[in-house]
Amino acid sequence: MVSLTIDGKDITVAKETTILDAAALLGITIPTLCWLKKVSPTGACRVCAVEIEGVDRPMTACNTPVKDGIKVTTQSEKLSRIRQKIMELMLVNHPLDCPVCDAGGECDLQNACYGLGAAKQEYGAVLERRKIRYDWPLIESDPNRCILCEKCVKVDHEIVGCNAIRVVNRGEATIIDTVDGNPLNCEFCGNCVAACPTGTLISKPFKFRGRPWAFTTTPSVCPFCATGCQIEYHSRNGRVERVTSDDSTYNSGNLCINGRFGYSYINSPDRLAEPMVKGQKADWNTAMGTAATALKQIVASHGADAVAGFGSPRVTNEDNYLFQKLMRSAIGTGNIDSEARLGFAATQKVLREMLGIAGASTTIDAIDRATAVLVVGCDLNAEATGMEYRVIKAATKNNAKLVLAAMRDIKLKKFANSHLKYRPGNETLLINALTKAVLEEGLENKEFCSANISNLSDLTAALAGVSIADAAAATGVTEADLRAAARLVGGKKGVAVIFGAELMRGGNTDAVKALINLALILGATAGDTGGLFPVYEKTNIRGLLDMGVAPDHFPGHQTDGTTFEKAWGKKLPAAAGKDLWQIIEGIEQGSVKALYLLGCDPVASFPEGERIRKALEKLELLIVQDPFPGEAAKMAHVVFPSSVAAEKNGTFTTIDGRVQPLAKAVAPSGDAREDWDILTELYNRLTGESRIHSPAAVLDEVAALVPAYASVGRTGGTITAQPRSGGLALAPVSARAVAGSPTTLLVGTILYHSGTTTTWSKNNLEIIPKGYIEIHPNDAAKLGIAEGGKVRLSAGSVKVEGTAKITPRVQPGLLFAPSHFRGMNVNALLSRDGGVVPVTVEKA
């Protein structure tokens, strides 16, 4: 610790502390321009100059560490003159085009000039106009306005890890530009725009939309991935025109392309604006009446079991709660499910059985403090970018060892100490081999295992027959790499284990169990550094299941419906309902006559899409409640146009149990209505009971019936349960090598889109407008396929065509295609068994 005096006030701080940070602890504000708390200091602007007794020149407070016994002065006439001159010199080369600059009203340079009293200009220069970069997608760069603070470069390199821009040239010719001088080719997260203190970097979609004070700012939650970033909608005249995030938020103001630019789906001209009945526009009374009458008739003729419904991770907790209440209480059916059946529901069941948790073992900020990170079967860049930022922070700021296990090269590889690029279908074998390597080398967390695990010997015995060398060869890695990976993650305190779609898709839980075994022997669930983190692409997947949108449990994962029967005053279905695939089979067999789709499009988004399409054609009643005219909506008998996240109040629950409120920024598009409002009216028409009048009232009902949500108020809260300790039972699983097929297709997410939602966003489509198929150069050469050429994939009777993208990111024999695009619809090639499928590939 170091003791010093600042402006006559004594303070003791850690020796690595800067003068700027020490002053802040005393409540003393030192002006800055180039300093940004979340990145390393640059010391470029020198506005933070301070005097230190005994030092013959002013020092920059942002990057000068404290020393014992020094006396610092932050405010004096001398410092005021210095700071004013610094500002005047900056303005010599600044165009002063404030009237037409998009940063006007929120420009740090303007504010600094005003705050420091820089009201005159004694200097002059002949300005050489520099070329404005209009050729970048989504972002415009005007180097004439740049003050060379380098905040954009620091954010790009240190937080995003993209390394797309840099400082180029020297002296008066210095500018910030792309690394190769070509148009910007990056992740288009816009974090550089947010960091820019002037109008050098601006959002092209927001350009000339208005001055910042003309917009209403509404704090909310990002509606895309399960990271749950906090955002602000900026709206005017009923339109959301911008999304930002403050650095004081849980996500430190960092967003991805979807969070910052994906908002344009809200304003899509393709939005459903009016109810429809049998393909014709109708008013709400007609649509509601048609749906209610048809549901009553089907229940009367065929029983309540003839009705089913799919909920959605895109809608709020309140919406999902009301949906399952409508199905169970008003209709009398337990046939309720969602896309969680495609993997996350089975994973959650294992987490609950083995650890007593419904999601992550702790909040995701614990990743920042991890000493080792293991990422398995997950492209964090695409599935949860906000979590990827935290892994990068752990690796670069905390020197955490990073091990990846993924079928493809992913962005995190540049930060990784080890990358186990395994063959498709061999996840469980790979994890078992890694676990055995940890145990063989004695790198398990012995203290945690001794205190908490009851059957470590069972796991050791189960792995006795596993040859690490044979497993390595079968999975496509080397024994040396496997053992090196074990040493990187083993023997550490504070291990974070993260896993995603490659492990969860299809609901085969062996790989998940194997990974939890590994996480436990590493002690990953102990303490507040590291943890166990399942990852899902869509924001409210955990809340969806917490609210009881599942055939086998009520809200709060309760299997006894007595509490809900008393609260709702209805006899509820005694047996578990049909799950997703049983519902589809029921439609095919004719026992399920009606299907209600809330915020989902199974034809475009689920595996076996063509089979599902044919099944939906057999229904007597298909109700679709959605903001967009997807494939299922085109087939619907009744369409209810609904709201998106920016048009409603409610809550989302993140994968790590943060229940966060979202606030209504604008009214629903056209004649669309909020989901909860639609559901409560239909409930009223079916039962005659009075309507619930607000999402807040729904949350109150949830809090009264679901113990985990009892402490969650209308402003949110955290429901993360601590994993069980003591008596934990490992779940040994066996695995054999999977030879695979000559060509395997992996279907997954990409950074630039989220589900099908962002395919309605013109901003996202500007970057990636259509689907494609990644193919290894060797495979492309064998088939005579050129970059950009047409490729045809076949699985059974289903055929899909797409554009070839030749890349060594995929291994030979493996193809990758993004799941988002309805026109290409590679999901139709998949079966219910997972996200990979053997395919035949040919030049189209």
Swiss-Prot record:
The keyword 4Fe-4S applies. It comes from the Bacteria. Optimum pH is 5.5. Not regulated by FAD or FMN. Residues 78-117 form the 4Fe-4S His(Cys)3-ligated-type domain. It is an enzyme of class 1 (oxidoreductase). Induction: Expressed constitutively. This is NADPH-Fe(3+) oxidoreductase subunit alpha. It comes from Geobacter sulfurreducens (strain ATCC 51573 / DSM 12127 / PCA). Its EC number is 1.-.-.-. NADPH-dependent Fe(3+) reductase. Probably involved in acetate metabolism and not in the reduction of Fe(3+) chelates. Unable to utilize NADH or formate as electron donors. Unlike formate dehydrogenases, contains no W, Mo or Se. Substrates are Fe(3+)-nitrilotriacetate >> Fe(3+)-citrate or Fe(3+)-EDTA > Fe(3+)-oxyhydroxide. Also catalyzes the reduction of NADP(+) with reduced methyl viologen as electron donor. No activity with menadione as electron acceptor. Heterotetramer with 2 beta subunits. SMART domains: Molybdop_Fe4S4 (SM00926), NADH-G_4Fe-4S_3 (SM00929). Residues 1-78 form the 2Fe-2S ferredoxin-type domain. GO terms for biological process: anaerobic respiration; ATP synthesis coupled electron transport. Its cofactor is [4Fe-4S] cluster. The keyword 4Fe-4S applies. PANTHER family: NADPH-FE(3+) OXIDOREDUCTASE SUBUNIT ALPHA, RESPIRATORY NITRATE REDUCTASE. Residues 215-270 form the 4Fe-4S Mo/W bis-MGD-type domain. GO terms for molecular function: 2 iron, 2 sulfur cluster binding; 4 iron, 4 sulfur cluster binding; metal ion binding; molybdopterin cofactor binding; NADH dehydrogenase (ubiquinone) activity; oxidoreductase activity, acting on NAD(P)H. The lineage of its organism: Bacteria, Pseudomonadati, Thermodesulfobacteriota, Desulfuromonadia, Geobacterales. [4Fe-4S] cluster 1 binds at residues 94, 98, 101, 107. [4Fe-4S] cluster 4 binds at residues 222, 225, 229, 256. It is found in: Cytoplasm; Cell inner membrane. [4Fe-4S] cluster 2 binds at residues 146, 149, 152. Gene3D superfamilies: 2.40.40.20, 3.10.20.740, 3.30.70.20, 3.40.50.740, ADC-like domains, Dimethylsulfoxide Reductase, domain 2. Keywords: 2Fe-2S, 4Fe-4S, Cell inner membrane, Cell membrane, Cytoplasm, Iron, Iron-sulfur, Membrane, Metal-binding, Oxidoreductase, Repeat. Residues 137-168, 177-206 form the 4Fe-4S ferredoxin-type domain.
